[in-house]
Each structure stands twice: as C-alpha cells, then as structure tokens.
Amino acid sequence: MIQRNIRTPIMHRAVEANGFVYIGGTIADDTSVSMGEQTRNILGKIAGYLKEAGTDATKVVAASIFVTDLSQKKEMDAVWTEFFGDNLPARATVGVADLGGGALIEVVVTAIKG
C-alpha cells in the first residue's frame, strides 16, 4: 500500500510505501538566512513530516543534499551532525547552480517506518 501525505501543488511532501517513508525535496521557509539557519529550518520541517508519518530522525537511512555553495558545506555539516548525533544516515552532497527562490540548500531523505 502507498500512502501519500502533505500534498502541495506539485508533489506530496511524504510518501509511505513498503515500510519506508520518502520525504521529497525540502527547502527553508526563510531563504534569506545563512546556510546553517536554512539547514536547521529544513531539518525541523523534516522532523515534523517524519513524526506525522509515525517515525523520527533516528530512522533516517539515506539523504541527498543539494547546495548552491560548497564553500559553506562546513556550516551545514555542523547543524547536520548536531541534529542526527550518532544516527547519521548515508548521504550524498551535490553542488548545484541554483535551487530557486534564494534557497542555499535542499534536502531529500528516506526513513524506515516505525
């Protein structure tokens, strides 16, 4: 069974299928702030999506991160490691030219349900 949650005009923020929760690309609400603050906001939003799906950040198994400025990666990494602690997921970080709307970072995660 597939369950789609939190519909937007172009996607569902979270999709549950076969014991996994897939969280689509998430950007910060305020894109005028630093990479670290955008990361903190995104991870807070993702935590909420995971909770709504009946899981949490300790169950995140993979992440794809897109950033517009790899020179700011250390700032993102500091917030990332603080958020996940000892439960760091597998991860890829990719530099991109533009994310639109002033976003510096976009995050996609996959978690285990439950």
Predicted regions, residues:
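Short, polar/acidic, helix-capping and beta-turn segments at strand->helix junctions
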Residues: M1-G114
